[in-house]
């Protein structure tokens, strides 16, 4: 897949604020500070398109980005940040739940896992929930540059055991080295492969 353009469209908390559902969407989900914003920036080759922060819990709305004028990437609020008030956590949960259950043009969810952290209940529940909703999931292990290659296998083992997924189901990503970018773009290509007929658009292929 070639990324020719990317722009921020809007933020929204409720369906009434979503952009029109006339383009297919891929959402990005994961715990706070897992690297969703950095991943999107690298995928679209636009440093700073999605604001990144070292402060967990910064993304508090659904953020919509239009790519190639043909599809949307949606940055969902992160979850699991202990210092966020309970009321805010519940609001984020409602936002995400409503979006995933009601957004009919959602084609896939990229679910991120930090290589340095064992999956928590929220991540595993979301993985199960996506399966129940029949939403294709692209699991990605992020921040792989934070551990040595010799330690990588040991670090990913708890993630494989907790999720029950084989290693080949995951993409491995580093915002620093850009490792995994092409692999993830290829998987997005597959997730969007039926949009030409459904939405009447043409997604540019890789050269």
From Swiss-Prot:
Gene Ontology CC terms, in alphabetical order: cytosol
GO molecular function, one term: GTP binding
TM annotation in the entry: none
Residues given in the record as GTP binding sites: 30-37, 57-61, 75-78, 142-145, 173-175
Domain spans labelled EngB-type G: 22-194
Keywords tagged on the record: Cell cycle, Cell division, GTP-binding, Magnesium, Metal-binding, Nucleotide-binding, Septation
Names of required cofactors: Mg(2+)
Residues noted as binding Mg(2+) in the record, renumbered to the chain: 37, 59
UniProt-listed Gene3D superfamilies: P-loop containing nucleotide triphosphate hydrolases
UniProt-listed GO biological process terms: division septum assembly
Keyword Metal-binding attached: yes
PROSITE patterns: G_ENGB
Similarity comment: family membership: Belongs to the TRAFAC class TrmE-Era-EngA-EngB-Septin-like GTPase superfamily. EngB GTPase family.
Function: Necessary for normal cell division and for the maintenance of normal septation.
Protein name: Probable GTP-binding protein EngB
Gene from which the chain derives: engB
């Amino acid at each position: 897949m070639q990324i020719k353009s990317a722009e921020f469209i809007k933020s929204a908390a409720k369906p009434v604020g979503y952009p029109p559902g006339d383009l297919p969407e891929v959402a990005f989900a994961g715990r706070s500070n897992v690297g969703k914003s950095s991943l999107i920036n690298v995928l679209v080759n636009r440093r700073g398109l999605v604001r990144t922060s070292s402060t967990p819990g910064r993304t508090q709305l659904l953020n919509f980005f239009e790519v190639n004028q043909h599809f949307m990437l949606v940055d969902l609020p992160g979850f699991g940040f202990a210092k966020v008030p309970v009321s805010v956590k519940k609001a984020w949960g409602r936002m995400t739940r409503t979006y995933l259950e009601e957004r009919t043009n959602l084609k896939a969810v990229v679910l991120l896992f930090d290589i340095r952290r064992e999956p928590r209940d929220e991540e595993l529940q979301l993985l199960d929930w996506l399966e129940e909703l029949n939403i294709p999931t692209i699991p990605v292990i992020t921040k792989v540059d934070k551990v040595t290659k010799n330690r990588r296998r040991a670090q990913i083992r708890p993630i494989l055991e907790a999720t029950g997924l084989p290693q080949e189901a995951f993409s491995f990503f580093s915002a620093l080295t850009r490792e995994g970018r092409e692999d993830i773009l290829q998987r997005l290509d597959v997730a969007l492969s039926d949009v030409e007929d459904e939405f009447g658009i043409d997604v540019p292929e890789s050269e």
